[in-house]
């Protein structure tokens, strides 16, 4: 944690960074297996973000589960669930299985009467992801759907996802 803070502050002062992307938030090596340490690391990042007006984005791993992508919640995190307490926003993202695309539909507005099916592409590089906004201190908590083309690393937000009624 001390090293992480030192690295971020070094770049902040030398390069005037405004954004930090931290791949897979986890505890420092001395505290592997201590669930509360992940919350401590998240608190350090949150304090840096607030005190230095930084945008800090991090990923967390989901636990292996059979939870449908639209039903994800904080209990699907592989790490300590208490990390949610210190986050401003928590988005849980999971790939929608190609074989279950027919079970989902999306709309362009959160409250809508027109829905669209998820198109099944022959190209295996085209995939869909559900994004459940589990926490948002700034407002709404929708469930969104994104289409990703892995070949070009292009993400398209399609709209609001739901299971077909």
Set out the residue ranges of the language-model regions.
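C-terminal regions of RecA-like/P-loop NTPase motor modules
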Residues: 1-20, 44-52, 65-165
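Flexible beta-alpha connector loops of hexameric P-loop NTPases
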Residues: 28-39, 68-75
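A short alpha/beta connector and helix-capping loop motif
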Residues: 32-48, 56, 91
């Amino acid at each position: 944690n001390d090293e992480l803070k030192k690295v971020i502050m070094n770049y902040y002062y030398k390069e005037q960074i405004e954004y930090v992307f931290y791949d897979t938030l986890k505890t420092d090596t001395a505290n592997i297996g201590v669930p509360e340490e992940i919350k401590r690391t998240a608190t350090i990042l949150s304090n840096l973000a607030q005190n230095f007006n930084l945008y800090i984005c991090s990923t967390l791993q989901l636990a292996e589960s059979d939870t449908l992508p639209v039903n994800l919640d904080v209990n699907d995190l592989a790490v300590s669930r208490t990390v949610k307490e210190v986050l401003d926003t928590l988005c849980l993202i999971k790939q929608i299985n190609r074989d279950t695309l027919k079970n989902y539909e999306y709309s362009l507005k959160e409250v809508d009467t027109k829905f669209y099916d998820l198109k099944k592409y022959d190209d295996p590089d085209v995939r869909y992801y559900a994004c459940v906004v589990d926490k948002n201190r700034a407002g709404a908590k929708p469930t969104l759907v994104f289409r990703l083309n892995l070949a070009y690393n292009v993400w398209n937000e399609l709209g609001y996802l739901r299971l077909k009624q």
